[in-house]
Curated annotation (Swiss-Prot):
L-aspartate binds at residues 172, 218, 449, 490. NCBIfam families: aspS_bact, PRK00476.1. Residues 196-199 are annotated as: Aspartate. ATP binds at residues 218-220, 227, 483, 535-538. It comes from Haemophilus influenzae (strain PittEE). The gene is aspS. The keyword Transferase does not apply. This is Aspartate--tRNA ligase.
């Protein structure tokens, strides 16, 4: 037998037992007559002692070095009282080695487990990086999450059904990864961006509760929390309303947090998209941050200051304030830095006012814009934002979207910089009632979620007549400023689906070409259905406390969508390309 116990599982209950351990040398210390090693496996670390009592094992241990793969047979003994290590889970015990077997020696590592390694080093030698205890713990947590999800889904009547990986390209927002067909030369499969249409078809097939933990692929520009291939917890239901779907999924996530880290998330508040954007400048607000954005256009619409009065009198403009309690200590240099920061989001500037004495009216205000205000306007502003002595007010004034984006980003930055965001808290919520459509860069209407989302309380005729007023029957789950899951009630009426396609500029010929199978299926007694998908990678990222999604994926890609370890993507064999009837054009 190669192993009877895991290293990290040993404790006082094992004292006196003979054990067989297999793992790696994490650290070695030679004290002359004694040799100690910290031995590591996926479960943790335990101290092993080589004593002259077992001379053969002691002699063999002299040749051990870090990362040798070994087997130890020995007895679990109590550590002397003065040698107990309270920082280790196994710190009350050690193993007295009786036999040592070296499975394999190790070259000097290109990584240093005790130092910060570059991201490139970690990804190139990922198989070594994954040996680090913190990385092993993250992947164990990921496995625990998927086990919990499967149990929950089974207990609630959901069926785990697989959907195809080789499918048809459909417009879902990002670019597809294409796979050429050898049999059907000149034609391509697409790797799925999500199982969206297949799970809807399963509802039409009568499988009223579906789930799948599934790989998805999107060829898009990457960020720290994005990967070209990622994993979704995909869910779809029939004959359930949006609140009923949210209730089931909230119970799942509530249970997941309790099971994984012992945290009770409580009841999730529900907030409309409009309220989230108005108060927090984001459709995924971080509620750990107490700062809020307050509209003041009605107060400043008549001031002699174009920066304020023009957007205040423009239906598409916005003037808003963030009050920072005790923020008057912020320096002019910091204010200049914040002004530069909001410029990233299109803001032309950042007005500010320090409240040195709230009882002194304008006399108690220090601000370059004070000269444009009068006592009545200042009093109304101070009351609206509940200004107090020692506060600072930051003003944003521009088009609605620019002001909202800039002030939302400033709110987050102020929360971090000033230590206002309560990092030890968990703040979940549901955001609902998103706009059905938004304008793209060319000014055309695009689906805010996807073209299969149902509008709320709109007929096809009403939708076609006034699409920009439509509210989507959609919902996102947000935790600490991260969208961890999103979904909607789906369109189940063929007339409504064709109407949405037309609004999006997809004519009847394109509808048949791209979605003919869906439009046909909708004709045969389609049930009302709704669902959502969670990002497993992002959930794991939150539950393990890392800010980089690559830390919770065993073999991730870089931000350039490359694998440094295997050197993928690579050039294809010319013969394979010939069989696929593909000719590669070299870029200049």
């Amino acid at each position: 037998m190669m192993r009877t116990h895991y290293c990290g599982a040993l404790n006082r209950n094992n004292i006196g037992q003979d054990v067989t351990l297999s793992g790696w040398v994490h650290r070695r210390r030679d004290l002359g007559g004694l040799i100690f090693i910290d031995m590591r496996d996926r479960d943790g670390i335990v101290q092993v002692c080589f004593d002259p009592k077992y001379q053969d094992a002691l002699t063999a241990a002299a040749g051990l070095r870090n990362e040798f793969c070994i087997q130890i047979k020995g007895e679990v003994i109590a550590r002397p009282e003065n040698q107990i290590n309270k920082n280790m889970a196994t710190g009350e015990v050690e193993v007295l080695a009786k036999e040592l077997r070296v499975y394999n020696a190790s070259d000097v590592l290109p990584l240093d487990f005790n130092q910060n390694n570059t991201e490139e080093q970690r990804l190139k030698y990922r198989y070594l990086d994954l040996r680090r205890p913190e990385m092993a713990q993250r992947l164990k947590t990921r496995a625990k999450i998927t086990s919990f999800v499967r149990r929950f889904m089974d207990d609630n009547g959901f069926l785990d059904i697989e959907t195809p990986m080789l499918t048809k390209a459909t417009p879902e927002g990002a670019r597809d990864y294409l796979v050429p067909s050898r049999v059907h030369k000149g034609k391509f499969y697409a790797l799925p961006q999500s199982p969206q249409l297949f799970k809807q078809l399963l509802m039409m097939s009568g499988f009223d509760r579906y789930y799948q933990i599934v790989k998805c692929f999107r060829d898009e520009d990457l960020r720290a929390d994005r990967q070209p291939e990622f994993t979704q917890i995909d869910v779809e239901t029939s004959f359930l309303t949006a609140p009923e779907v949210r209730e089931i999924m909230e119970r799942m996530v509530h249970g997941l947090w309790l099971d994984t880290i012992g945290v009770d998330l409580g009841k999730f508040p529900v907030m409309t998209w409009q309220e989230a954007m108005r108060r927090f400048g984001s459709d995924k607000p971080d509620l750990r941050n107490p700062l809020e954005i307050v509209d003041v256009a009605d107060i400043v619409k008549d001031v002699e200051f174009k920066v304020f009065n023009e957007p205040a009198n423009n239906p598409n403009g916005r003037v808003a304030v963030i009050r920072v309690p005790n923020g008057a200590e912020i320096t002019r240099k910091q204010i200049d830095e914040y002004t530069q920061f909001v410029g990233i989001y299109g803001a032309k500037g950042l007005a500010w006012a320090k409240v040195n004495d709230i009882n002194a009216g304008l006399e108690g205000v220090q601000s370059p814009i004070a000269k444009f205000l009068n006592e009545e306007v200042w009093k109304a502003l101070a009351e609206r934002v509940n200004a107090q002595t020692g506060d600072i007010l930051f003003f944003g004034a521009d088009k609605w979207q620019t002001t909202t984006d800039a002030m939302g980003a400033l709110r987050l930055k102020l929360g971090r910089d000033l230590g206002l965001t309560r990092l030890d808290e968990w703040k979940p919520l549901w955001v609902i009632d998103f706009p059905m459509f938004e304008r793209d860069e060319e000014g055309n209407l695009a689906a805010m979620h996807h073209p299969f989302t149902s509008p709320k309380d709109f007929s096809p005729e009403q939708l076609e007549a006034d699409p920009t007023s439509a509210v989507a029957n959609a919902y996102d789950m947000v935790i600490n400023g991260y969208e961890v899951g999103g979904g909607s009630v789906r369109i189940f009426d063929p007339k409504m689906q064709q109407t949405v396609f037309r609004i999006l500029g997809i004519d009847e010929e394109q509808q048949r070409e791209k979605f003919g199978f869906l439009l046909d299926a909708l004709k045969f007694g389609t049930p009302p259905h709704a669902g959502l998908a969670f990002g497993l990678d992002r959930l794991t990222m939150l539950l393990t406390g890392t800010e980089n999604i690559r830390d919770v994926i065993a073999f991730p890609k870089t931000t350039a969508a490359a694998c440094l370890m295997t050197e993928a993507p690579s050039f294809a064999n010319p013969q394979a390309l010939e069989e696929l009837a593909i000719q590669v054009t070299k870029s200049e």
